[in-house]
Design a protein with these regions (language model features):
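Contiguous, well-ordered beta-strand patches that form the walls/edges
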Residues: 82, 147-185, 283
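N-terminal glycine/threonine-rich, aromatic-flanked beta-hairpin/loop signature
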Residues: 126-162, 233-260, 265-268
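Bacterial N-terminal signal peptides
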Residues: 12-22
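Short, surface-exposed coil-to-beta transition loops
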Residues: 125-131, 152-157, 171-175, 202, ...
Length: 343
């Protein structure tokens, strides 16, 4: 049995390229001896995530010191802590919350203006979104929205009615609410993707920061928590070489699997929504950081879809563990995809 989990995440490369290497070495911003919730205990047990917490503590203090409305900002932070704690022990969820919040804090003190271009905060490049708002008179707001969900996309234009710190839009079964959150804009959607003019799995909800350009993306295996440490990430880069990026391009949806042969290993089936026949992979991490990876690759002038298999373990270089074999058979679907055993 597998449990699917969609992870709408993306990070800012400008911020994390500078800070990521130091994350694992930093302690959390709170006393781990007093950690009470599952999320706090998970943070304290994982040095990389604890480092993100430390960075957030510093960014929070600096942002609060410059806030024009400290009370509103504290309320917002308390709400964020509630959302963080909903992750419980899920490291991918926790890392995504922290990375997203670090981006938000960079923009949260920017003076709010309905006349702006906005980018959706997301750790994954597969869930980017852009919103352009223009105020037309005292009570109306025109908007132009676009968003991605895996390889699918959506776009919507309309006119919303402004009341105080919110604007609302309703047409048939599509309802949007635009809410001011300090210097940010929060979009809430009611109605499914098709009702709002979008492809399968595409939604406009989320927090948007004022920026005329797309947020720099620094999406890696650490962001997804497929690897735990910088050392493991470097091992994966060395093993996969150019296919490290192929692996990242293989997943907007993640599903957990189990292996009878690799006791205690974490196996993650991943695929790109809308392009699962060409963009998919399985990533297996052993209890000591061993790696087994199989991924789809489009090769040659005929765009043949092949499977490339990598592992750090010499004894597995020429055979597939059970969970990888099952993935390979499922992806082949009777057509027997060519299998390349990579060195």
């Amino acid at each position: 049995m597998s449990a699917s989990l969609v992870r709408p995440l993306r990070a800012s490369g400008l911020l994390f390229a500078v800070l990521a290497c130091a994350a694992a070495a930093q302690a959390s911003s709170f006393d781990c001896g007093k950690a009470a919730s599952r999320s706090e205990k998970a943070i304290c047990a994982d040095p990389y995530t604890a480092g993100l917490d430390s960075q957030l503590g510093q960014a929070w203090s600096a942002t609060l010191a410059k806030a024009k409305d400290p009370k509103a900002l504290r309320l917002d932070q308390r709400q964020w802590l509630k959302e963080r704690d909903q992750c419980e022990g899920d490291l991918a969820c926790l890392r995504g919350r922290y990375r997203s919040r670090l981006i938000e804090l960079r923009y949260i003190n920017v003076p709010f203006n309905w006349q702006a271009t906005w980018q959706r905060v997301s750790v994954s490049p597969f869930y980017a979104g852009e919103l352009v708002t223009r105020r037309t008179g005292q009570e109306h707001l025109t908007f132009d929205l676009s968003a991605a969900g895996g390889a699918n996309s959506g776009a919507l234009q309309g006119k919303a009615l402004i009341k105080g710190d919110e604007a609302s839009y309703a047409l048939d079964d599509c309802n949007l609410r635009f809410s001011r959150r300090n210097g940010l804009l929060e979009v809430t959607q009611e109605g499914d993707a098709s009702a709002c003019g979008a492809g399968n799995g595409v939604y406009y909800s989320g927090r948007y920061v004022p920026s005329g350009q797309a947020l720099d993306s620094h999406y890696d295996l650490l962001a997804t928590a497929l690897v735990r440490t910088e050392e493991e990430d470097q091992r994966a880069r060395k093993l996969l070489q150019k296919d490290y990026q192929t692996l990242l391009d293989s997943g907007s949806v993640f599903s957990q699997e189990t292996s009878a042969e690799l006791k205690g290993a974490e196996a993650t089936d991943m695929w790109l929504q809308g392009l699962a026949t060409t963009n998919a992979a399985i990533f297996v991490r052993g209890t000591k950081g061993e790696l087994w990876v199989a991924l789809l690759a489009v090769a040659g002038s005929s765009d043949e879809v092949r499977v490339r298999y990598y592992t750090t373990e010499p004894e597995w270089k020429h055979s597939l563990p059970d969970v990888v074999q099952h993935w390979y058979e499922a992806r082949s679907k009777g057509q027997q995809l060519a299998l390349d055993m990579m060195p």
